[in-house]
Every structure is written in structure tokens, then in C-alpha cells.
Curated annotation (Swiss-Prot):
It comes from Gibberella zeae (strain ATCC MYA-4620 / CBS 123657 / FGSC 9075 / NRRL 31084 / PH-1). This is Developmental regulatory protein wetA. The gene is wetA. The keyword Plastid does not apply. Induction: Expression is positively regulated by flbD. InterPro entries: WetA.
């Protein structure tokens, strides 16, 4: 009866234990050597059981030796599985030591199938063997059974709490070469919590592994690199091109030249807006480039139905990774080809091409995705092979300009690749060309894409209405005709029209010049008169807009607003007039005091 109560917890727990439950993600899940065993530090591997586990309870010295047949009945079943990878080449006592100590931690694990009564806190000391003496009669009530009654539970808890490490140390020291068994049996709660945590983690990770295994290799690389490596056998028939060193597996047939936009692939498979570049060739010049292009998977909506280069006109409706032989250009995104759909609404879809298809171009990546977007290099220009590419002019007229240049920059993913030296670009935040295009193309393209010119001027015969204010000339410069084609502007300076400001200013300036002792004919006086006269020349005839020229500097500087110098000049003139008035009044008073006739003097022309 006591033997049954001993062995039953081992049997139940051992059968239910998963030998490789520690890390489900390890490829070699059946690692049976103790080096990968996490609980190795909590297990006593010594081969002398009676002395190493002798005195764990000082109160039961009369515990008889449990029969060797207890463990020799099923040594491999109860120990190889219960100790989770403990080597079975140890002797029988060592096996029993391992299993008896592991069993203290096993009942608390949540995945076990033991009865709930046996999964309470059971200290390893309550399961230890005594000194080869007899088995106590009450000992079997403290040993965990499959079913344990509630009154016995406090006794088990009491045993786990009243153990003293002082008795255990001197007996286990001489025969135990591994000191962790004296240190790690004390925190039983810690061992149980740790084992249950690992058990839960392994149960949570367990369903994730088959998902990564069963997932088909998608060109978007949603599966991790290891999952790609596990599926090597699925694509052996399709590996036309060798896998690139920068990619993770034979899915790299979709990435022919070893290009991987993002190893972690968080790029959404969204269809961005219509994105085109400004060009300086006019409004009917298409805007597409082999050097910098949209991602191959990001087809614009209006591209659907456009027949592209002749090498793409084969009739298989494909998500691309299953036909890598037919496509030498990578398609990192799964999509049914838009150019395989109906060509409704685009009658001018054919692109006449003279010479080989552009899959012979460097990089094998260029596709004229939109016939309306055949770029500036197609306008009677040579491609990289030195052959002309002709585009229907009707397609050029249908090309429209998308002013949202920032959308192109925002929706293109970054490149995590060392750029080719031939890709001559600024490399600021614009994704660089993926193929080995010529530097001349990239230089011209970067000049046009980084600094887009103003919108082209549509040809028209009527003149633009000029801006009403002189300061708005800079804003309307791109829309107004070139300055050289205008009629020579008539500056408002050489005018003879005098207003009241002009007359008053002239008299005042002449008076001030004479009052200061300056002859009116001197250059200073003439400059003052001309300056005061210029202030009135704002309205010349019926001109609604005055086009100022460099000769209008005097008018612009003096006639706009009174500056500090003009205010000072006016103040000095007022002061001089006040002095002259006071002087004349003083002279008149002096004449009157002398008895002279002031009126007679003024009649004779004497000016005070």
C-alpha cells in the first residue's frame, strides 16, 4: 500500500510530461541529454541516494528502505520522461533520486493530469527517503497520492513549513558533489512558479510552430526567415535563379537580384495614389523613369488594362511566385497582374517597341507600367541598349500632371540596401533606383524630381493680366510673360505734371534753400526741388499700373512714406521760419520804440 502511494504520482506525472517542453521553438525537440535541461540545477544527479537524501525529516528515522524494485520495475518510464531529458545511463539509485526530486516540482505544473489533491504544495523533503531503515506508518499519509483527503492537506503543508535546513546540510554534504541540491530545495514556491511559467510559455508557443511550418512562402515575406528556410523542398522545382545571399530562403526567386525592401516586412500592400513626376519637357511629356519607379507591386488603379512590354503578355493569370521562370523581374507583392485584365477604356494601350524588350536592361526590373507614363527617355531617346523606343503621341497627350509630389516620397518604402555606385543620386530620403541604370538618366531624373520646376506655360496668344500691386510681381512671375517681351516701361520720374504737393514742396524747398544761404541753382537746391517734384508723379496720365524701373529710385525712396531724414528736414525748416518771424517782429518793435513809422517802411518795400 505505501509503495502504491509512492509510485502513482511518478507514473501519472511521468506519462503526462512532455520530454521536450522547455523550448518548443528549438529545432531539435527530442534533445535527451541533460545539457539542455532547464531543471538540471534543481535536480540531484548524484548516485548515492540514502546519504544525500537521508535526513530531510529528522522526525522519521525509522523509515525502511523502499524496495529496489520500486524503481527497477519501470526505471526508464518513470525517470526518462519525468526528469525531462535526464540521461538514463545512471544507475538505478541515481534514477530514483532524479525522479523523486523532480516529482516535487511536477505536481504544481498546470498541464499535468494528476489529481487536484496531489497538485498542492508538496515539499521535496516530504518525498525523500530515509536512512535505509523502516518506513513509518504515518509516512504514507504525507506522501502525495492520486486522491488525498482534505484533512491530510494541512499536514502536508505543515511538513513543508517545518523543515530545517540545518539538519539537511551536514548529511548531504559528504556524498553530494553538487551543492545546488541543498540550496534549491529551500525555495519550493520559486521552483513551482518557474516551472509553471515555463510550462505556460511552452503551451503558448506550441501552436505557433506549425503555423510557421504550414504557411506557404509568400512573396511579402510575412513568415519569418526560419520558416522560409524550413520550406526549402517546396521550391526546388522552381528555383531557376540561385537564391541571393541577402535573402533568407529560396523564396528569393521573387527577389532576383537579392533585393529585400524590408527584412521585417511591415510594408502594407496598398495601392497608392497616382504618382508622377514633374518634367521640364511640357505638359504632354509622360512622367515615368526606369531609374526611379514605383514598387512593382504598387500598380496604380488606372494601370489596370494597360498592356505592358511584350514579355509580360503571356496568358497565365498568376500570383507571381508560382511562375518565376516567366518573369525575370521581381514582384515582392502578391497580385494578379493588372495588365492581364481587360483593356476597356484604354484603346491606345499598345506600346510599339523597336528592339528587344526591356527585360534585357540592367537589373531586369524596368516595366513600362503605364503606357501613358512612358517617360522622357522614350521620346525618341535611346534606351540602355542603344535602340529607339517610340511612343504614340496620343498617349503623351493623355498624360496628366500630379502636383502631389510629396505623395510619391511618402508612399515609397525605404531601401535597406547598399546603393550601387552607379545610382548617382542625392540619397536623402528618396528611394534610389534598383537597377544599374546609367548615371546620365539618374542625374537628369534627380534634377527633375528633387527640384520640380513650375508648371509649364500653356501656349496662349492673349497677355496675362498684370498684377495690380508692384509687390505681387514676384508671385506672378511664373504665370506672366517674360520681361524682355514687354514694351519698354515708361518710368514715372520724367514727368512735368505738378500737383499741389509739387508746388508747395517746390516753394518750400526753394525757400529753405535760400534761407540756409544756398543759391537755388546749386545742385543741392536742384536735388531738393526734383525730389519734391517726384513725389507728385504717382499718377501719370491714365496708367493704372506703374512699372517702376531703376530710375525711379528717388520716387520710391521719398514718395512712399516720410522717413526720419524728411521729418528732420521739415522740423528744421519750421524752426528757421519761426526764427525769421521772431526776428522780424523784434525789428518792428525796435522801429516802433525808436519812433519810426513801421507802415511807411513796409510800403517802401522793407521786409522785416
Amino acid at each position: 500500500m505505501p509503495m502504491a502511494s509512492w509510485t502513482l504520482p511518478y507514473r501519472v506525472e511521468a506519462v503526462d510530461r512532455d520530454p521536450g517542453f522547455y523550448w518548443q521553438e528549438i529545432e531539435d525537440g527530442h534533445n535527451n541529454d541533460g545539457s539542455a535541461d532547464f531543471f538540471g540545477q534543481f535536480i540531484n544527479f548524484d548516485s548515492e541516494i540514502p546519504s544525500s537524501m537521508a535526513d530531510h525529516h529528522g522526525h522519521n528515522p525509522g523509515m525502511p528502505t523502499l524496495a529496489d524494485g520500486l524503481m527497477l520495475d519501470h526505471p526508464s518510464e518513470s525517470t526518462a520522461s519525468a526528469s525531462s531529458g535526464v540521461s538514463t545511463t545512471e544507475d538505478e539509485f541515481d534514477l530514483f533520486s532524479c525522479s523523486s526530486q523532480v516529482d516535487a516540482t511536477v505536481p504544481s505544473q498546470p498541464g499535468s493530469s494528476a489529481a487536484p489533491g496531489a497538485s498542492h504544495d508538496v515539499d521535496p523533503r516530504s518525498l525523500a527517503l530515509a536512512d535505509s531503515s523502516g518506513l513509518m506508518v504515518e509516512k504514507h499519509s504525507m506522501v502525495p497520492r492520486v486522491s488525498m483527503s482534505d484533512p491530510e492537506l494541512p499536514r502536508v503543508d505543515g511538513i513543508s513549513l517545518q523543515s530545517s535546513p540545518g539538519r539537511r546540510v551536514p548529511v548531504s554534504q559528504p556524498s553530494s558533489p553538487t551543492p545546488p541540491n541543498t540550496m534549491t530545495r529551500k525555495p519550493n514556491k520559486f521552483v513551482e512558479a518557474l516551472s509553471s511559467t515555463i510550462r505556460k510559455a511552452s503551451k503558448l508557443r506550441k501552436p505557433r510552430k506549425p503555423i510557421a511550418m504550414d504557411r506557404p512562402g509568400s512573396p511579402t515575406m510575412d513568415n519569418p526567415p526560419r520558416a522560409l528556410r524550413l520550406q526549402h523542398h517546396e521550391y526546388n522545382g522552381n528555383d531557376v535563379f540561385p537564391p541571393s545571399p541577402t535573402t533568407c530562403g529560396p523564396d528569393s526567386t521573387n527577389f532576383v537580384h537579392g533585393f529585400c525592401d524590408d527584412p521585417f516586412d511591415e510594408i502594407p500592400q496598398q495601392h497608392p495614389n497616382n504618382m508622377r513626376f514633374f518634367k521640364t519637357n511640357g505638359i504632354h511629356t509622360p512622367a515615368e523613369s526606369p531609374g526611379i519607379k514605383t514598387e512593382p507591386g504598387m500598380y496604380q488603379p488606372e494601370m489596370a488594362g494597360q498592356a505592358v512590354w511584350p514579355h509580360q503578355q503571356h496568358p497565365h493569370p498568376h500570383p507571381h511566385p508560382h511562375h518565376p521562370q516567366a518573369h525575370t523581374h521581381p514582384h515582392p507583392h502578391p497580385h494578379p497582374h493588372p495588365h492581364q485584365q481587360a483593356v476597356a477604356g484604354h484603346p491606345q494601350h499598345a506600346v510599339p517597341v523597336v528592339g528587344p524588350a526591356p527585360e534585357t536592361w540592367p537589373g531586369h526590373e524596368y516595366m513600362a507600367q503605364n503606357a501613358h507614363q512612358s517617360g522622357w527617355w522614350d521620346l525618341n531617346l535611346l534606351n540602355q541598349n542603344g535602340e529607339y523606343v517610340v511612343v504614340d503621341p496620343q498617349q503623351q497627350k493623355n498624360a496628366n500632371l500630379n502636383l502631389a509630389m510629396h505623395a510619391q516620397h511618402a508612399e515609397l518604402p525605404y531601401e535597406y540596401q547598399v546603393h550601387d555606385p552607379n545610382s548617382a543620386g542625392l540619397m536623402i530620403h528618396m528611394p534610389q533606383p534598383r537597377n544599374d541604370s546609367t548615371p546620365a538618366h539618374d542625374l537628369a531624373l534627380n534634377a527633375q524630381t528633387y527640384l520640380p520646376p513650375p508648371p509649364p506655360i500653356p501656349p496662349t496668344t492673349e497677355r496675362h493680366r498684370p498684377p495690380r500691386a508692384p509687390s505681387s510681381g514676384a508671385r506672378h512671375l511664373s504665370c506672366s510673360p517674360i520681361r524682355k517681351t514687354r514694351q519698354p516701361s515708361i518710368p514715372p520720374t520724367p514727368t512735368t505734371v505738378h500737383s499741389r504737393h509739387s508746388s508747395n514742396g517746390s516753394v518750400a524747398s526753394a525757400r529753405s534753400a535760400s534761407g540756409r544761404g544756398m543759391v537755388p541753382g546749386t545742385p543741392t537746391a536742384m536735388r531738393k526741388q526734383r525730389r519734391s517734384r517726384d513725389s507728385s508723379g504717382g499718377s501719370v496720365g491714365d496708367i493704372g499700373f506703374v512699372n517702376f524701373t531703376p530710375s525711379d529710385g528717388g520716387l520710391l525712396m521719398t514718395g512712399v512714406a516720410p522717413s526720419g531724414s524728411s521729418k528732420t528736414k521739415a522740423r528744421r525748416e519750421r524752426e528757421a521760419m519761426e526764427r525769421r518771424r521772431r526776428l522780424s517782429e523784434a525789428a518792428m518793435k525796435a522801429v516802433q520804440a525808436a519812433g519810426g513809422d513801421v507802415d511807411k517802411l513796409m510800403e517802401q518795400g522793407f521786409a522785416f
